[in-house]
């Protein structure tokens, strides 16, 4: 697989003002089955209020990586982002859901991406988030297992309920 993607440093990217967002991105601001972003607005303001745009996404990514432990088998098909934050453990799907949730609570469109990530050991399918910054979608892996430059995107949706996770 050859991946040809321009990868930008997330922290250097600007958010797009909600009223200037392309119409097809607006749905990715809404709460969804696994990402109850409306329940995180106070938390996001308190924890990440001094950041905006890509700096906020980088801070969220780092917070998730530092505060949530990757534990195989620690979640089920019913685990939401809220469950993951409370339990402080999850798998790649859960890490993606938390990042999506916190981005949406920040008025930054975010979606779930099912991907193939050759850097993941053992090699397997993987789940990451995509955020809409500077007028384009950018892959963000809060687990730190895969770089955006090597990820092959398979499918995207509001959350795992819309995307086959292989």
Give the ranges of each region predicted by the language model.
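Solvent-exposed residues in well-ordered beta-strands and their adjoining turns
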Residues: 2-6, 132
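Secondary-structure boundary elements
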Residues: 3, 11-12, 18-90, 98, ...
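Short, charged, solvent-exposed linker or helix-capping segments at domain edges/interfaces
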Residues: 8-15, 141
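Hydrophobic/aromatic-rich core segments of domains that either
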Residues: 62, 94-166
């Amino acid at each position: 697989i050859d991946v040809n993607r321009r990868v930008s440093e997330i922290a250097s990217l600007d958010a797009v003002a909600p009223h200037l967002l392309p119409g097809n991105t607006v749905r990715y601001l809404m709460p969804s089955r696994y990402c109850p972003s409306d329940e995180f607005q106070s938390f996001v303001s308190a924890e990440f209020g001094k950041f905006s745009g890509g700096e906020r996404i980088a801070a969220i990514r780092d917070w998730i990586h530092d505060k949530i432990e990757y534990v195989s088998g620690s979640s089920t098909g019913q685990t939401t982002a809220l469950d993951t934050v409370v339990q402080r453990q999850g798998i790649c799907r859960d890490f993606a859901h938390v990042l999506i949730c916190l981005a949406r609570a920040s008025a930054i469109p975010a979606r779930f991406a099912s991907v193939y990530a050759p850097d993941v050991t053992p090699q397997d399918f993987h789940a990451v988030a995509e955020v809409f910054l500077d007028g384009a979608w950018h892959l963000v892996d809060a687990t730190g297992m895969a770089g955006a430059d090597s990820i092959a995107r398979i499918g995207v949706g509001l959350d795992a309920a819309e995307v086959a996770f292989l």
